[in-house]
UniProtKB/Swiss-Prot annotation:
Name of the protein described by the UniProt record: Non-secreted LysM effector LysM15
Organism this protein belongs to: Penicillium expansum (Blue mold rot fungus)
Region (Disordered): 1291-1317
Domain LysM: 1179-1225, 1231-1277, 1328-1375
Membrane-traversing stretches: none
Amino acid sequence: MPPHPNTTKENIPSLVKATPGAQSLRWMLLFAFLCSLVGNAYGTHHQHHGHQHLHHQVRDVKASATPTVTSSSSSSLPSTLEEAKEIIKNAQASLAVMNKGRLAYPQWNQYIAQPKSKNGTSPVAPALGTEHLATNHAMIAKIALNESKTEDQSSQKFSYTIPSGVAHAAKLVAEASPQSPGSHGVDIAAIRRKYRPQRNDTNRPAQKYAQSNGLDGYVHAQAPMNSALDSDSGDDESQLTKRSSADFWLTTMTQRGSSPYAPEGYKVWRNVKEYGAKGDGVTDDTAAINLAVSDGGRCGADCGSSTIYPAQVYFPPGTYLVSSPIIQYFNTEFLGNPLDYPTILAASSFVGLGVITSDVYTGDTTEWYINTNNFLRSVRNFNVDVTRTPQDAYVCGIHWQVAQGTSLENMVFYMSQDAATTQQGVYMENGSGGFITNLTFVGGNFGAYFGNQQFTTSELTFINAKNALQVHWDWAWTMQDVIIENCVNGLVIVGGAGGSMSTGQSVGSLILMDALIVNATNGIVTSLFAENSTSFLLQNSVFRDVTTAVLDSAQGTEILAGGAAFGVESWGFGRVATSSTNSTFYNGQDIPVMERPVSLTYMGYDKPNFFQRRRPAYTNIGNTQIIDVKEWGAAGDGTTNDGPILNSILDRAANLSAIVFIPHGIYIVEDTLHIPVGSRIIGQAWSQIMMKGSKFENQLKPRVGVQVGQVGDVGIIEIQSLLFTVSGPTAGAVLVEWNVHQSTQGSAAMWDSHFRVGGAKGSSLQTSQCDKSDTAVNTACVAASLLLHITSQSSAYLENIWAWTADHDLDTTAQEQINIYSGRGILVESQGPTWLYGTSSEHNVLYQYQVSNAKDLYMGMIQTESPYFQPTPHAPQPFKAGLFSNDPVFADCDSSSANCFASWALRIIDSSSVYIMGTEDCQQRAFEISQSTDTWIYNLVTKGIVEMISPVNEDPTLAANNVNGFMSSILAWVRGSNSTIGERTFPGFQIYTADSLEGQGLTESCTPALTQKVLCSPFLKTWTSPGIGQYYKNTTFTDMLCDAGCGESLGSYVDNVETYCANQTIGSSIPTRNGGTIYHNYNLTCLEDKDTKEYCLDTIMDFTTVESAKDMPTNELCSYCYTTMLEMRQASIYSSYTESDKETLELIQSTCGLTGPTELHDPPYTVTPTPDPVCVSNTTYTTQPGDTCDKLAKQYSVASAAILYANPTIIGNCSDLPASRDICMPLGCDTQYTLQDDDNCWQLQRDYGLGPDSIRQYNPWLDSDCLNMQGAREILGSVLCLSPQGATHNTTGDGITTTPGNGEYAQGVVSPPENSTVAPGTTTKCGRWYSATADDLCVQICLKSGVSAKLFKAANPSLAADCDNSLIAGDAYCVGPVPRWNDTAYWIETATSSKAVSTPLASAKATGSV
């Protein structure tokens, strides 16, 4: 149709006067963090109905299964058609007023319980068509939507019930009148093909069984392996060429779904035709459909919620005529045939608000279900036609008041295209979350009319509407991939309606991204264009033939001009922060934008859109086998351990490339359930996988409940409609570990699957076990360690995922609050690409989301909520941090600030390319960023938060500086791609990597503890040898090493390893050996004199120089530093504490009047009997009183430190050797040097003509920068070697043939010694050779030649693990290969004889030997 006439005030919605609302936030992940306002932490009374909870506010009423929307106090039934028509005429006249009033005065979310009547029942609204409703019709009819109301108007009530007489009259009129669907004149499939690419419905993995194995059925796959089977189910091709509905696999199966706790005979699967629906477009099917929905005593009026009455209600193809609302009960899926969408046709006699409704008003403020608790609903694969309903009655296709775990998918809404129509597709006045995707709207006054706390919508198409979509309030909303064609107004953003039920909340935060608006008068209309009002972001969107791109309707001014065709990369209005402390109001300006990684995107309307993928419908499965797990032996009865049979079924199905159908049930698994790569799984009404049993009970030994693939798997995973849960106590349960990486974009994916910990029948975590009145932690209610772990080698596409630790009981009438303890929510370590669309994580102790060492991550609308019981106990209690990557320890929380000890909403640690679109928070701190880059946050909104964002080592972004009504909001928090946010003092290092621990047989909890980062200077990584501390003679440098945060990190590391790695070993050592040694060296190095506050090593270095401890002045011997350091060494298994130290400590105790242990301690490794050590030099010496290493070094031409290292169990200090002990003298060196004050390596190498790093090579105890050369003299002595130990590079002896070299490598190739045989396999790219003798040992050869043992063996592969016994006397071995000796491609052989070799530097011939 052509565009509507020029816009006037009448067809541009005006705005209601409202108080500034709570604004929501957007990131490249929309994050709504919602807090529980409890107790002394948040300054409100700690009672259930007193805080502002997003879900749990209930009526104290008795359960009921009321099946009908009609009033029990009905009027008499009409006896004639004419009488029925008159009743409907009057009813619809009232309907036009009442439905309009409902839109004008919508009910906002209510966070307190509503009052009851005197008899304890919920109040009942008056009946439609009564005199009460006719009062003031004339006045009410004059109200324009979104305009300010008078006090008299604001007091009107707009709820009603439908009497049975009215409903019956509507049925009679409907069946008496032709009701065929109208002619809409729109080719929806063509429009979708024009703008959106056709995508795979599913990806088929290769069938592993090439032939029957005798156990499983073999199905030959006609479709190519790893190929698409079908076009996207949302492409509406089914509307053009309909396949036979009999081909829908689900309808051909025996229905075995059951609910273990429901009454016997209860049906999960319901086909509406089996309940009397005809689907012929003539018979009124309203009653039959409602009977199909309500059958079995389900949770309806005055029930609140229930988990034991799930239902999947199936609609075969057809046209279902309805004359009053179809009521969707709690925990219900409405499923249309995906091959041929059924049509729900609203009759011309229709009475009600929504053709399908998710909630029923019983009064202006009371309904069947609390909207913020209205969980677990799905409607998909339908056409909804309201064109026949009265044009002025404001009838909608779906009245959708929902919360988490809900979705609308694959639907087409048809409305009148008359300019005067009031019809609408979706009406949503309130709620708390959900997901909507692949909806098409044709015609209507509003395609969609939205209001909700936080929501995600994707892939919406609007055609020929007056107003494509309007948002009248929210906290946070992400709209992605929206197409608007031929509408007067595209997106309308209004200020919320007024009235007695208004909270004053306006549109807080809204993102419109990857959108296309074509042929519209106004692309976007808003009156909230003002400082401290709505945060709005328009990103990567295109306008074509749009008169005005953005219109300020309050002022009647153009904010952003239209045009024939142009794109908007990033534009909006709101506060923008480019540093932690300052934000600036951007009043309709370009907003900084990220560079989207290719891996996260696909084709777009201008620049690439973020990738999306809809859940598979499996509409054309070909010869693929469908496996029903109950048919194959699984019970799903909530009692039987189904783990073994499910593991077998899933393994076989993956091998067959079959699709696994899990009928509804509760499937107990008592150990890990393995979902192999290649699995495609579909549940029914959220089939439950329930972890239970002793293997999940130990929080110190986490156990994965459902493992999706093995680490390193690449391929296909498709999971949908499952619920992962537990039966407590299960403190160690990791509900899902995701390991699979995609093989094609988005091939590893999960949709509409949720996590629930407690609060339901069968969980053993309900009111009777875990009532919130329990002030102490009930260990039986500690129920999970981690909900979802996306591991480092994986990628994931997740859509509509709700991870909920229950805060209330879903299966009791009053839905009492409970205390359930889950450690962590969602941990993302993936290196990408990973997408999180419409996800939520709530009520976990340490964090709701943590992004750790991750990259290439998109998070679109994440919502969180903290546990109600916090800050009692203080986080991380009752859990111990350190089991998983970068667990928060809350060590920086001041004990006087209780608010600090609350869970983090989101932490981004050591990550890059993280894009977040929107958030809303509530507590002292909620969002931490540490050592991360390319992180972009949009539309951040907080409530009750002191610090909006808390980057490490930076000033926080304060909510008080970004006030927006009663919220605080930031449109964009951005730094640029190369900026490091939250830069730590030290990035940190790992003592162990995961690869280095492979094959050690460590437990799943031990490895993460060992691989945690230590947040210290990298210098400390070398402190793994037992010592007495590190002295650097540089206080500034030591201050840096002794950072307090480093000590906390080391202490936490050692503590965690001790806890999680108890009774395990790494080789022959205890797991804490390296970490404990570093920590002990840190404590020694950083110990300060209690009086002078100088470092103790600085103090000791100024002590009087003496020959031995017994010669020390008493004040020095008995000083705090000297005695304490020696006591610390004695007390620690990680220290160097020798017999000499023992004698000194005994001397201290006898001289200084101290007491305490002095005995030697066991080393931190297993001591096994070994032969007496070999003295390489064959020279021993018996020590005499007064001997020092320096004295003996000069006598034997060795380095003083070499004496200590050759005798580590005897000598602990070169200045004080124990007498009468036989010690081994090391190999000598030709050139010695006695250190002088201020000497350094660089100077000595220059003065003595030595090559770079030579001194460290000859004296390997020196650290990487020779920084300990001076500081270690007291312990290691002062005599250095300036030539190799055991040999020199001269040309006068036999044994080593050489050319000059640098370190252990030679500079040029030489031929092997004449008349020698080169050992088998030894490289000829060698510049130093050694001819072995019968008495040689490998260690002697290495020491003489200056080559490391590793390089020696690599260059001479004939030397086995037992190197000494592999040596062959007379053979020549390479002891100095040239650089790149093993790079075959580098060398070009030009040999002219067996002795000629090539070299990159120079060819040389031996001129002698040493």
